[in-house]
A protein has these predicted regions:
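Periodic glycine anchor positions in long extracellular repeat architectures
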Residues: 53-58, 74-77
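Extended, Lys/Arg-rich, non-catalytic nucleic-acid recognition/anchoring regions
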Residues: 1-49, 62, 79-222
């Protein structure tokens, strides 16, 4: 999926240029690429019906079996791009996006603007992770499942990123930095810091304690 998102852009050229700008600092390059790809998808993207499932979110034989459409993760929609994608200088794209951020209201709940924003954030996270993994594509292609805007316990929206098993191939640094990238991007969309419930924290502590294969085992207070 990531390859199809990046195909119409100049991401490879941007990576080479930014590698020189940041003197080979991969982490800085990854964060900047994530911001660029997110901005491009938001500014030049448009929500369309997924052709694979014809907008239903499901594929299969109507009478015998159905399953969630892989191409759209069951949403029934996908993101397409207008003719500007790949033609506008990345710095101009960032400037245009930053102006939109300053004005606010990048998205409205339960509208196509939310779907577009979620897709843009997802693209940014995957692209940034791809830079960090140095070509080990299974992590950014299959390891990050989705990015969604969900409500905190206080009723305000936050960013939720879902991961799957292939994320393990990114390595610990790549996994951790993908969360950092997500935290940086979510601020542009006015999303609050996630508020973890007591039950979620306790479950995390239990699961970490049960998983003995960790290189570093944090204590419960940590």
């Amino acid at each position: 999926k990531l390859l199809s998102y990046l195909a119409p852009r100049n991401t490879a050229e941007q990576i080479r240029e930014l590698t020189k700008v940041f003197d080979g600092n991969r982490e800085r390059v990854a964060i900047e690429i994530a911001k660029i790809v997110c901005a491009e998808s938001y500014l030049y993207g448009k929500i369309e019906d997924c052709p694979t499932c014809e907008g239903t979110g499901e594929v299969g034989n109507n009478d015998k079996w159905k399953k969630e459409c892989y191409d759209c993760n069951g949403s029934g929609t996908e993101i397409g791009f207008n003719d500007e994608i790949g033609k506008v200088n990345y710095q101009d794209t960032l400037d245009k996006f930053n102006e939109a951020v300053k004005k606010g209201n990048l998205w409205t709940p339960d509208t196509e603007s939310q779907k577009l924003s979620e897709a843009a954030v997802y693209h940014g996270i995957c692209a940034g992770l791809a830079v960090l993994t140095e070509g080990i594509l299974v992590a950014p292609l299959e390891g990050v499942v989705s990015a969604r805007f969900l409500k905190n316990g206080n009723g305000k929206h936050t960013l939720s990123v879902s991961y799957a098993g292939p994320i393990r191939s990114a390595g610990g640094t790549g996994q951790a930095l993908s969360v950092l990238i997500a935290d940086i991007i979510r601020r542009d969309f006015g999303l609050e810091f996630p508020l973890m419930s007591y039950d979620e924290i306790e479950r995390y502590k239990e699961e970490v304690g049960m998983y003995r294969g960790l290189q570093y085992r944090p204590s419960n207070p940590q």
